[in-house]
Amino acid sequence: MALRKILTQGDPALEKVCRPVEKFNKRLHILLDDMRETLEESGGVGLAAPQVGILRRVVVVLDAEENMLELVNPVIVRQEGEQDGFEGCLSVPGMYGRVQRPSFVTVRAQDREGNFFEASGEEMVARCFCHELEHLDGHLFVEHTDQLYTAEELDEIMAEGEK
């Protein structure tokens, strides 16, 4: 396994639509292993293949129990409700924005062997599914927010909300 460099906003790879995975082979397994390690090292909750320069429909995310889910060729098959909250992105380091997302999401995907499965999540996991799948179509969360905040500004906003 190896750490991969995470691309940042402005890199053209982050604006491209990713191709589906067709071969479930050792190269895919290496990519998934590297993405897992890169996500663990970064401290994030999700990572999409284009963020490491690979234009394939592959995502790794942490679920509510902090288990790592590998999603190959994922699609959202169900979404319900609405939530409004802050999110950030490893490709937009140090910046956060308020984004509307569904409060519950089910995705259908394939595992590293090509077997189909469904995974569901609510609140933060639903947010993460939506956020990461948008990367596969060349989009960043900043397209959904009117204003970006630094970590310090976000801390102040959150502290005000607790009063």
Show which residues each predicted segment covers:
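Positively charged
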Residues: 1-163
